[in-house]
Amino acid sequence: MIGLRPAFSTMLFLLLLTGGVYPLLTTALGQWWFPWQANGSLIHKDNVIRGSALIGQSFTAAGYFHGRPSATADTPYNPLASGGSNLAASNPELDAQIQARVAALRAANPQASSAVPVELATASASGLDNNLTPGAAAWQIPRVAAARQLPVEQVAQLVAEYTHRPLASFLGQPVVNIVELNLALDALQGHRAK
């Protein structure tokens, strides 16, 4: 029994440290230093939570920028079902899905003259991406401007405003948060797109 006492004491100490002290300390530090991020990076408009800056949403109306396709089962951008399609690059079903997305994108964006950006035709590993490259957002500008009856230059300026650049180029590439951009479009016009 004497040999078990140090083992139980060590177990109890580590249980309190890793199960109590460490989680409380990291939660407190997160709330103190990064309160917005620690609480889910929620976007509030008119005292209502409109979404998270970290999770994409399904925007399908012509007056909205469309994000990457979601691979989540049943409901697009369902955070409870996060994950990719798990289809191999050699799987004919994946090729068929991409071809169908490209055809739908071309039909929805007849003003776009260049090739469909890859990230608009392929789902991400999480299925919840909220960001696009500035090029993929720019590809959609003519459709959004026409649907909202706004000058192309004004929509392009809004895309430029919502392009987030990393502190240094080796830390990543510029991205456009589609949720924030679409909410800014609504705020610009004072209503939701049809």
UniProtKB/Swiss-Prot annotation:
<dbReference type="InterPro" id="IPR003820">
    <property type="entry name" value="KdpC"/>
</dbReference>
<keyword id="KW-0067">ATP-binding</keyword>
<dbReference type="GO" id="GO:0005886">
    <property type="term" value="C:plasma membrane"/>
</dbReference>
<keyword id="KW-0997">Cell inner membrane</keyword>
<keyword id="KW-0812">Transmembrane</keyword>
<dbReference type="GO" id="GO:0005524">
    <property type="term" value="F:ATP binding"/>
</dbReference>
<keyword id="KW-0630">Potassium</keyword>
<keyword id="KW-0633">Potassium transport</keyword>
<protein>
    <recommendedName>
        <fullName>Potassium-transporting ATPase KdpC subunit</fullName>
    </recommendedName>
</protein>
<keyword id="KW-1133">Transmembrane helix</keyword>
<feature type="transmembrane region" description="Helical">
    <location>
        <begin position="12"/>
        <end position="34"/>
    </location>
</feature>
<keyword id="KW-0472">Membrane</keyword>
<comment type="function">
    <text>Part of the high-affinity ATP-driven potassium transport (or Kdp) system, which catalyzes the hydrolysis of ATP coupled with the electrogenic transport of potassium into the cytoplasm. This subunit acts as a catalytic chaperone that increases the ATP-binding affinity of the ATP-hydrolyzing subunit KdpB by the formation of a transient KdpB/KdpC/ATP ternary complex.</text>
</comment>
<keyword id="KW-1003">Cell membrane</keyword>
<dbReference type="Pfam" id="PF02669">
    <property type="entry name" value="KdpC"/>
</dbReference>
<comment type="similarity">
    <text>Belongs to the KdpC family.</text>
</comment>
<comment type="subunit">
    <text>The system is composed of three essential subunits: KdpA, KdpB and KdpC.</text>
</comment>
<keyword id="KW-0547">Nucleotide-binding</keyword>
<keyword id="KW-0813">Transport</keyword>
<keyword id="KW-0406">Ion transport</keyword>
<dbReference type="GO" id="GO:0008556">
    <property type="term" value="F:P-type potassium transmembrane transporter activity"/>
</dbReference>
